[in-house]
Amino acid sequence: MIPDNRSQQGSLPPTIFLMGPTASGKTDLAIELCRTLPCEIISVDSAMVYRGMDIGTAKPSPEELALAPHRLIDICDPADTYSAADFRRDALAAMSEISGRGRIPLLVGGTMMYFKALLHGMSNLPSANQALRAEIEREAERDGWGALHEELAEKDPDAARLIHPNNRQRLMRAIEVIRLTDKPISSFWQSESGTSGQHPQSGIEDYTYFTSWQADESAGLPYTVFQFALAPAERSVLHSRIQKRFLAMLEAGFLDEVRALMARGDLSPDLPSMRCVGYRQAWDYLSGNEDYDSFVAKGVAATRQLAKRQLTWLRKWRDVHWLDSADPQVVLDTLKKSGLHTTFNFE
């Protein structure tokens, strides 16, 4: 469903969300929309924030950026961390500046946690503590991640049932919260959802950082939000695109890009930047842990899994208009039904 903007145009400025799985054609559609609408693009991609990671993240080309500049890309060094809270702060500032000039913020990407953080805000869980995380990492190296999962099972059985022992990021977060607050992380889920022990199995990331999944909190974002999700109707079409794009990245020099990152000497495969899909598999291959064919197969498979997770989030998303085609006219026709064209004069 697209909101009827006619009753709100005097109070809330519009913004457009263009969401979708990787390789669905979001960038091309966004650039086309900028030709017709007074839009300015804000990237919603947790990998594109990093400088020097261009090929493997499918960043817009210099030619595309000249046509439609993107905000929130190339803003971090790969050695740094960039959180959903950081994104929310930066995106809100960019949206305010864009709408203040009478233009429309167009948020484009597939990092669904970022979209959710923007719509619903962050949970009241504590921020990450780097010193404590380093301590937990040392314990894991000494005793194994299985020992940490056993600790979680003892202190927070609800969380242990949902967090797989191999999901190191979520396991570390759960242990971190317990040690920072002396409370099980599941107690935060319960207080936010209003229930006890009832958590869907859709992914632990739904709960480790955010408020309850389907809470009616979108009014907290001071915009009239028009939400679109772009994805092929046939999963096989998306899978084919993913494979072709991964192979094209390799031809474009993706492995040389990762070699340059490894040669810096200050990066490791445990950093969030190097855990990005494709980079993690390339690091393993260049470290001699995989043969080339296995690397390619794992890179494609990991990208497909990413797309599957993105689609899982989107299928639960409220008030979203699904697009099977990257035809900008479909978006424009939908926006016209809301009355938006009377304010911004587009056909």
Curated annotation (Swiss-Prot):
* Needed co-factor(s): Mg(2+)
Which residue ranges does the record annotate as region Interaction with substrate tRNA? 45-48, 169-173, 275-280
* Catalytic activity entry: adenosine(37) in tRNA + dimethylallyl diphosphate = N(6)-dimethylallyladenosine(37) in tRNA + diphosphate
Q: Which residues bind ATP per the record?
A: G20, P21, T22, A23, S24, G25, K26, T27
Residues the record annotates as the site (Interaction with substrate tRNA) are T111, R133
Keyword field: ATP-binding, Magnesium, Nucleotide-binding, Transferase, tRNA processing
Does the keyword Transferase feature in the UniProt annotation?
Answer: yes
Q: Which residues form a coiled coil?
A: none
Can you tell me which family this protein belongs to?
Answer: Belongs to the IPP transferase family.
Function text: Catalyzes the transfer of a dimethylallyl group onto the adenine at position 37 in tRNAs that read codons beginning with uridine, leading to the formation of N6-(dimethylallyl)adenosine (i(6)A).
Q: What is this protein called?
A: tRNA dimethylallyltransferase
Naturally occurring in which organism (per UniProt): Marinobacter nauticus (strain ATCC 700491 / DSM 11845 / VT8) (Marinobacter aquaeolei)
State the gene name recorded for this protein: miaA
